[in-house]
A protein has these predicted regions:
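Conserved Walker
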Residues: 390-391
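Conserved structural motif at the start of ABC-family nucleotide-binding domains
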Residues: 351-353, 366
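ABC-family P-loop ATPase nucleotide-binding domains
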Residues: 440-481
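Helix-to-loop junction immediately C-terminal to a conserved catalytic motif
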Residues: 397
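Transmembrane alpha-helices and adjacent helix-loop boundaries
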Residues: 1-333
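Conserved ABC transporter NBD signature motif
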Residues: 405-412, 425
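The feature captures the beta-strand-to-loop junction immediately N-terminal to the Walker
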Residues: 379-384
């Protein structure tokens, strides 16, 4: 099991496996190659919903809608417009991504149950359009005559593409997508996705725009599903709305959950399982979804991290767990330069709060608060529970927009600006409970915010889930310096 996890996490080994499959495809039955192609299409679908749900935390119950848009767009482009196959795939990918970007607008304003219902509605709308637009999609009778590798009518610049060649093209595309996704989730942008998933409020306090992350997540997710749809259309050669109904959306989500939400390798496990499982359940076709339900119950109960959690290898940085913290004095570099600069500006008011009022549905939490925060000084806010201390901090940091009043930072009014804009200007806040990403190392959590001295040298690559509570809080606080 550990060896399987290593294969899917190592670029060279993954490339060698792809070459072996590409060569082996020419020596196995056509039906087997066809199944392998289905596996890759399902991997693309699973990776798409994983970017949206597993990494950025936006649940989707209508992902088959993006799948359908890509399939019909590519089929129409080739069949009706005579567009070359590669161009048709590009149109399918960017067309579905554009729809995802449009959907991100209203979807970004709702959460949890309402987000699930909105995504469900999107999937149902696409399904009904595919049924009713008979002149475009063929309606319930389906769209026939699509250039297909299965029947030998698909060509790329004059070259005929058979089932084996089609699989090899899919394999190359999958390899490129996997490498791009792996690099993406390790980048600053990928860390921003995880931050929004864990806590949108904390992400905003780090200068991360939640709206921008959601737009990117919907666009990437929709694009991957559209790419999968384009490949599906030209492999089957026939499209019907029933291939993109509600149950298809549920299958895609279940596939990702079983594999392991948030794990790129887990999506491969889930796709392989849910490509071959229906073949084994054909004798129990009437009970297929009961079996799916039982699998979900099993996963949620015994394997909450999915198959990826079962197969995940032990982190190669586990040796850091045995290290002891260095003396606090040794870990802290001198701050004399910063302190001297602070003294020089000590008479200046960096933040000025003027007559700020904050009301929640008529309940006044802040009533004309005014104060100044000066450079180089420490200001304490004291009061009993419910007196509005946290509300004032939230208003200053942009989490709440004040009902009235002004908040000046370096002479500019920042009242009402979103929290990520306030953080980018230079004002951030910490939280009583550490809101970092548990699966990230300390270093990765620090990198989500401005890099500063952390005093965490013994734990630079240790998962914060296993770090002591005080150290987790310190890591979270230092990332906002």
């Amino acid at each position: 099991m550990k060896q399987l996890g290593n294969i899917l996490s190592n670029s060279w080994t993954l490339g060698a496996l792809a070459v072996a499959l590409a060569v082996g495809a020419g020596h196995v039955a056509t039906g087997t190659v066809q199944m392998w192609s289905f596996v890759i299409i399902n991997i693309l679908l699973a990776q798409g919903i994983n970017m949206l749900t597993g990494i950025s935390g936006q649940i989707s119950l209508g992902h088959a809608g993006f799948f359908a848009i890509g399939a019909y767009a590519s089929a129409i482009a080739m069949k009706s417009w005579g567009v070359p196959f590669p161009v048709a795939l590009v149109l399918a990918t960017f067309g579905a991504a554009a729809v995802g970007l449009l959907l991100a607008g209203p979807a970004g304003r709702v959460r949890e149950f309402y987000l699930a219902m909105m995504s469900l509605g999107f999937g149902l709308i696409v399904y009904e359009l595919a049924r009713e637009l008979r002149g475009v999609t063929g309606g319930v009778m389906g769209m026939r005559g699509i250039p297909s590798s299965q029947i030998g009518t698909l060509q790329i610049f004059g070259w005929s593409i058979d089932t084996v060649a089609y699989f090899r093209i899919l394999l190359v595309v999958l390899l490129v997508v996997m490498l791009m996704l792996r690099n993406f989730v390790k980048s600053h942008f990928g860390r921003a996705f995880y931050a929004v998933h864990v806590s949108e409020i904390a992400a905003g306090s780090l200068g991360i725009s939640q709206a921008a992350v959601k737009r990117a997540a919907y666009a990437i997710s929709g694009g991957l599903a559209g790419l999968a749809g384009g490949f599906y259309a030209h492999m089957i050669g026939y499209l019907t709305p029933e291939s993109f109904g509600l149950m298809r959306s549920i299958e895609i989500l279940v596939m990702s959950i079983v594999g392991g939400l948030g794990s790129l390798a887990g999506q491969v496990y889930g796709a392989v399982l849910f490509t071959y499982l229906p073949q084994k359940l054909q004798a129990f076709n009437d009970y297929q979804y009961i079996v799916y339900g039982l699998i979900l119950v099993f996963i949620f109960t015994l394997l909450p991290k999915g198959l990826a959690g079962l197969l995940r290898t032990q982190t190669r940085y586990s040796k850091f767990d045995q290290l002891r913290p260095a003396a606090s004095g040794a870990a802290e570099p001198p701050l004399s330069r910063r302190e001297s600069a602070a003294r020089a500006e000590g008479t200046q008011a960096l933040v000025r709060v003027e007559d700020v009022v904050m009301e929640f549905s008529g309940l006044r939490a802040l009533a004309g608060v005014s104060l100044e925060l000066r450079a180089g000084s420490i200001t304490a806010l004291v009061g009993p529970n419910g007196s509005g201390k946290s509300t004032l901090v939230n208003v200053i940091s942009g989490i709440y927009a004040p009902t009235s009043g002004r908040i000046l930072y370096k002479g500019q009014d920042i009242a009402g600006r979103p929290s990520h804009k306030v953080a980018q200007a230079g004002i951030t806040r910490t939280f009583q409970d550490p809101r970092n990403v548990p699966s990230f190392t300390v270093r990765e959590n620090i990198l989500m915010g401005p890099i500063a001295v952390t005093g965490m040298a013994p734990w630079p690559r240790r998962s914060t889930r296993r770090a002591p509570g005080a150290r987790r809080a310190r890591c979270c606080a230092r990332s906002k310096r």
